[in-house]
Structures are given as C-alpha cells and as structure tokens.
Amino acid sequence: MLSRRDFLQVSMAASSLYGASGFGNWAKLAAQQKLNQNQLLEFENFGNVSLIHVTDIHAQLKPIYFREPEVNLGVGDALGQVPHITGSDFRRLYGIDDGSPAHYALTHDDFIAMADGYGRVGGLDRVATVINSIRAERPDALLLDGGDTWHGSYTCYHTQGQDMVNVMNALKPDAMTFHWEFTLGSDRVSEIVENLPFAALGQNIFDAEWDEPAELFPPYKMFERGGSKIAVIGQAFPYMPIANPGWMFPEYSFGIRDSNMQDMVDEVRSLGAELVVVLSHNGFDVDKKMAGRVSGIDVILSGHTHDALPEPVLIGKTIIIASGSNGKFVSRVDLDVQNGRMMGYKHKLIPIFSDVISPDKAVANLIDQQRAPYIKELNEVIGKSESLLYRRGNFNGTWDDLICEALIEEREADISMSPGVRWGPSIVPGQDITREDIWNVTAMTYGKAYRTEFTGEFIHIILEDVADNLFNADPYYQQGGDMVRIGGMSYKIDINKPQGSRITDMTLLKTGEKIDPSKTYIVSGWASVNENTEGPQIWDVVENYIRRNEIISIEPSNNVKVAGI
C-alpha cells in the first residue's frame, strides 16, 4: 500500500505530465495568434477541492510586458534548486521547448523577439476571465490572494489602494495576506480591512506592545468546500519593520513565528480541518524551510519572491505552489481530500496572455472607472526607449540602471543607490515611456530621493548588509528582493563568503579610483526607511531625466563582478 508521501510523489508526476500537456509542451508557435483561450484554460477536473492562487499583483490593472530574471542565484541548500534556475537551464529542467509560449512566459532569453510575437501579459480583466472559467467548473473554488496587491502604480498611490480594493472585491477572493499593503500606514490598512468582504489573515501579525495576536488579522479561517473542511492560515511578510519603514505601522510586529504556525496547524486540525493551506508571503526559500519544520501543512501558496514554477515543489508531505507576479499567472490546484487527508492533486500554472484571453467586460469597465480620473496624467508620453528596460535580476536591471543615472545627474551625486525590489513591468525597444510606466517602477509611499554624504566604509557596510539579506545560507535570514542597485561605482561580490567579506574592489567610476573607506562621497538614493527623509519624489527625478534626454538607450551594466557561482 502506498504511503501518503509515496502517493504525493506519484501525484507530483501526474502534475508534471499534466503541466507538460497543458502548459510546458505546447507545439512551437510562431506567434500568439495561434494560441487560443481554451488551450490556456484546459484542465481536467480532479478530486473535490479547487484552489485558485494569485499573488504579488503590485497594482497592475492593465496588461504589461514582464521579463523574468536572468540571474537568480541560490546559496546553501538552495544552490542549483528551483527557483534558482533560469533561462535555458530552467527550460531543460521542465521540458519546455525553445520558442514556445512557456519559454516566453517563464524565462528571460530572446525576450524582445518573443514579446513581439506573444504580446503583453496580465490585466486583471483577463485574470477575472480565468477565475470565472474555473468557477464555472468548480463553483466553490477558493480564491486566495497572497498579498502585495494594494501597492505599485500611479492610481494605487493616489487612491491609497482603493482602486485595487475595488477591483479585487469584484473578483471575490476568500482570503488574503499582506506585505506592501502596510506601507499605506496602519490607519489606512485598518480602514480598508475593517470593510473587506473576505478574510484578512496573518498568524504572524502581532500587537507590538503586548506581543499578542492582532485582533484585526485572524490567524486562519475555516471553509467547507467539496464536502471537506479546509483551514486557510495566513502568513504575512515576516520582516516588515526591517525591509519597510516600521514607523508606518508601529502597532504591529511580525516575524516567521513557525512555533505559532505549528500551534495554528494543530488547532485547526483539532477543529476538524481535513486540508490545511498556508497562504504565505514568506518567499519561496523561507516557505521551503518552514515546510520542513512545521508538520501538518498540506499546501503552501507561496508569495513575495515572485517565482513562477510550472510544477509544485514537494517538501516532506507539503506541496509548495509559486504563482509569479504582476498578474502574469494564475495557479489552479485541484485536490482529492478523502477520509480527513489530502490524497493527491493536479496543478496548472496558467499564463495570462493578454491577446489570447478575452477580458471580462464588467471587470474591464470597473478598471476603466478607477483610471478615468487620472487618464491624462497616466498616458502622457515622457520619452521613448530604444532599449529593453527591465528590473528582475540579482544584481542589476536596466530600469534600475536608468534610475541610478537619473539620481546621479538630477541630484548631482557621485554614487547612487536604488532598492533591489522585484516589482515593476518591462518596456520593450521602440515603446513610448509614459508617466504611468515611470510610476509602475517607482510608486511607493516613501519614495523621496535623498542626497547625502556617506563614507566609503559606510557604503561598504550597506552593500554587505544587503548581500547578507540575499545570500545568507539560512533562508530564515533572507528577506527576499535583490541586491541594492549602484550607480557611479563598481564592485566585486563573492556570494559564498561570510558577511563582512563578500564585497571587494569598490571603485568610483568617474575617476577609476578605489573607494577610500575614510573618504566622504555624495550619494543619492530613494526608498529610505528613515522617517523625515527629505528630497524630491523619485518619480519626478526620473521623469525630469527622461524628459530632458527624450530617447533612452541603455545597455545592461557590467559593473558588478560576481564570484562564487
């Protein structure tokens, strides 16, 4: 008789085969016009429970271009493991044909040519079509939002998240968890959450003063679907006050709190839960470690690190699902729950090809209503790009190279710094750069561009600190995101060295001189977590730079030399 783990491993193989026929092994297609919506949505119902997962939408209401990372390095046990495999290696692992839709959706190479053929991705009106299609087959499917939803665009900033709240309410989620939402400030978050028609979950959101669970955010919610009791436990981003300004939400503390997670799993099991789902914003590697430490979790729906995987990853008896970002994918998971336990599943990562999937008319109209008061500002053309502008990658992206150049020129600095965030769409060569495009990569509630003086020693400390957040071998010390971007300076990094000795050969580009630890340099940056930061907003800095230059031509930077890979 098969053990449950053996059964899940067999089920994993079935998921792989299903993913290959439904996603990864489409015939090579010259252009997206040869795809059709039925191919994207095709799914043979399985079991008695369906989950729908979206995460890290970052307020992208409309279709976009989005290039996946070229470099996404893993360290320690994550070395050479997904999601730390990219490009052709990723395609070989999953049996994805070169030139296929899956190639375009999941990997970075040949992006410009393939974007011309396959077009834009995402758009919440298209996401709505996918959700409605699944619900037509499974009316009681659970829709779960992994957070980073009310942040990341011009309209989201100016409405304090209300545009996204309105549109997501129309999609009718059953639960969500949180990260960037808290940068709206705790008062605004409370105002929204108190009026949500669905569960706002976070087992690790605590009252900072009393170190007790925060009343506004229940740890879990119980559902009955397909004749089975299901517990959904929320896991908000653990490192909120470190990665984001703690002064914006001083009432709350976070942390991984895996001991409390175990207590919650045990509690819901005692209440009769036959399926335990964790809706997580930990990041994929943190979720893998948590799955190995907390027993009794059946499914982790992973968010934060923006990974998109066409197959689940099995850790012990827990499957982990990664559903990408920016509205580019929707995951469907069908589960067979029998006699109080999960016996198997089928999974499909559905890419949202915007020219193939028809928009839901009601949601499309609702999106247009949110944008209408701002449409003139959104559509104003600031310049044109001759280059591919993208963000994702451990060390640099051309969007951030552009932002760093703007900071140096507009703020008259020696060195510039841009945060290694992973959100923000891409721009293809020949595309106009609108104000909306600029805000899509800069919009945040603490975006002032500071100009200050740092010693060479302090710059080194900053780089070492961020590098440890990214390349610490223990996932519980990783905060997600990528390396801080640097303009005006080059350096070498050995990702396998210990903290304090990873960063060497720091050089000021305009003189070719080594950075002097005792010398002071003028540094401009943005997204400081410090309260009362002064300076112009970063989107104004970038807009002024692009408007003045008109045509943007920028090649990927090679100013970071990477060792240890």
Predicted feature descriptions by range:
Residues 1-2:
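Secretory targeting signals
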Residues 5:
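Residues within the helices of the helix-turn-helix
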Residues 38-120, 124-130, 136, 249, ...:
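Catalytic centers of hydrolytic enzymes
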